[in-house]
Amino acid sequence: MQIELIIENKNGQTRPLIYYFMKIYVANVISRDEIPALYKEGVDMIGLNFIKEDSCYVKSINSHVGTIPNYSIEEINQRKNNNTTAETPIIKRVGIFKDDMPQTIITQMMVYKLSVIHLMGDELPLMIDNLKNSVIPDLKEDIKVYKNITIKTSDDWIKAKPFESHADALIFDLNETYCQCDKVEEIEKQLNQLQLSTPYYICGELSPAFVSCLKSSLSPLFQGIVLDKEITNDNKRKDISTLQNFTKALK
């Protein structure tokens, strides 16, 4: 993401001053109590996993009241603790889905107050359009949809092209062979050939060194990184000291 400021010198001449701010999206957050520490480290978005077969799946409890959506676990815990007014730092919530029906996604969007939908499966551009048309403006003023694009070989980059003007951002999930500083030039070349106008994020087997190389090389469309296993410990919780290595690399 970039912010452009116009500055004026003492002679009245102006020039643009551009600042780049990289965003950090941490996927598969499994506990509410992790959020304050992630917020403190400058994380912009957290991902809640709604893929049922995944070990990080966000469980919910059936409300047993007709069509009323299920309650989220965190809401149940708040009620038990009479803590309905407790404040949690504001970080955008991302819902992670794979080949789900739009209605299922919309239900979880409302229950968990999601700002972004991250699609991991074989969803088509038409599905994204239908989802957004079902939500905006009747249910929410806006909802962002990010589409995951898995990159294993050079032939995979073109898969991003159909999602132009449909997805709000692309997430390029890089094979480990791409996650090296000496591959950044090739990544840049592939992206330039696509001539994308859609913002994008990078994820995969990331390292702080690789992230630093990316930040220095890619275009203003490069919004930031998605972290998950790189900062996850054996208890499936996010390791803050490891996260700090990535935040330093983005500065």
Which role does the model predict for each range below?
Residues 58-70, 130, 232-251:
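C-terminal helical cap(s) of enzyme catalytic domains, especially alpha/beta-barrels
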Residues 45-56, 118-124, 174-177, 218-243:
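Glycine-rich phosphate-binding active-site loops on the catalytic face of alpha/beta enzymes
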Residues 21-90:
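Basic, often amphipathic N-terminal segments
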Residues 38, 117, 170, 214, ...:
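Conserved, mostly hydrophobic/aromatic
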Residues 39, 109-110, 163, 215-218:
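Non-catalytic positions within long, well-ordered alpha-helices that form the structural scaffold/packing
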Residues 50-55, 59-61, 84-110, 114-210:
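Conserved anion-binding
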Residues 42, 113, 166, 218-221:
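Short loop/turn motifs at secondary-structure junctions
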Residues 1-21:
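N-terminal amphipathic/basic-hydrophobic helices that include classical n-h-c signal peptides
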